Amino acid sequence: MTISVAIAGATGYAGSEILRLLLSHPAYLSGDLRIGALTGHSNAGQRVSELMPHLPQLADRVIEDTTPEVLAGHDIVFLGLPHGHSADIGRQLGESVTVIDCAADFRLRSKEDWDAFYGGEYAGSWPYGIPEVPGNRDKLKGSNRVAVPGCFPTTITLGALPAVAKGLIEPDLSVIAITGVSGAGKKASVAQLGAETMGNLKAYKPGGTHRHTPEVLQNLQPFTQDSVSVSFTPVLAPLPRGILATITAPLKGDVDKHSVAQAFRDFYAEEPFCLVLPEDQQPETQNVVGTNMVHIQAHVDERTQRLVITAALDNLCKGTAGAAVQCMNLTLGWEETSGLPQAAVAP
């Protein structure tokens, strides 16, 4: 059986990254996966070669308008649409279609959190696409609906989770996360101009106002009886891709660097996309770009008795499109790592 796949919002950064990954997926190369409709409302009628010349295999394909009628009839539909647009289309696609949503519409389990951070109609929640969080993988297997997580929550969750779950820290987290400009999407804005971003660093959405904050809390709270709090400040950097998060929290009990290192290694021992680095190495964005990997390090600050965790990933790959393809593999019962790079391009 050949699986047909459509991508809504194919010309955006998330959509085009999904296409890049699918084009090297073993199922596509063997003919078991077919790339069907490619849609993009503002680019309808244009050829892929005009918009995404880095995808020559699809050069002659024409972008269609994003409508439920165009997307219906496919086995898998990836939604790479702005927040608020996915819920309406998702409702109109039948249960026979597996919908994998890269927006925020179905991530939050709490209506109160949705109202506080997004507003508008609350659409409910779908199985959440970080398979590495215990319990998530089983919910994703065979599911016909998937909510792909935000890029910051993936970085922070996978960085902090071993420490929270193993009781190494008081779960009062302070997070500063540096991100590349592609995280804001392709929509034109003065703040994203090269003249505004090159040679510049800028914090934004400070004071707990960033929309990804409740996702982090939602992910970590089930793994501790203590109340989790997160003070999160994102920082925009002149990078196309990549996130580097620094997470600190007070240590709990008798914890040293050896027990911390062992706890992190044990937690991710069976996870192919989570690499806990040797003590003398630090996560770097250049070492994860283009991959579905998360590189993680944890150090004990003995003077302040705090744990310092650093985590790096590619916001467009493991942070969005790679997670979407990883979840697709799980919903179809395929090998979870299929089509997902672990080796970066260096330098």
From Swiss-Prot:
SMART domains: Semialdhyde_dh. Its EC number is 1.2.1.38. Its main location: cytoplasm. Pathway: Amino-acid biosynthesis; L-arginine biosynthesis; N(2)-acetyl-L-ornithine from L-glutamate: step 3/4. Keywords: Amino-acid biosynthesis, Arginine biosynthesis, Cytoplasm, NADP, Oxidoreductase. GO terms for molecular function: N-acetyl-gamma-glutamyl-phosphate reductase activity; NAD binding; NADP+ binding. GO terms for cellular component: cytoplasm. The keyword NADP applies. It is an enzyme of class 1 (oxidoreductase). Pfam families: Semialdhyde_dh, Semialdhyde_dhC_1. It catalyses: N-acetyl-L-glutamate 5-semialdehyde + phosphate + NADP(+) = N-acetyl-L-glutamyl 5-phosphate + NADPH + H(+). HAMAP family: ArgC_type1 (MF_00150). Catalyzes the NADPH-dependent reduction of N-acetyl-5-glutamyl phosphate to yield N-acetyl-L-glutamate 5-semialdehyde. PANTHER family: N-ACETYL-GAMMA-GLUTAMYL-PHOSPHATE REDUCTASE, CHLOROPLASTIC-RELATED, N-ACETYL-GAMMA-GLUTAMYL-PHOSPHATE REDUCTASE, CHLOROPLASTIC-RELATED-RELATED. This is N-acetyl-gamma-glutamyl-phosphate reductase. It comes from Corynebacterium aurimucosum (strain ATCC 700975 / DSM 44827 / CIP 107346 / CN-1) (Corynebacterium nigricans).
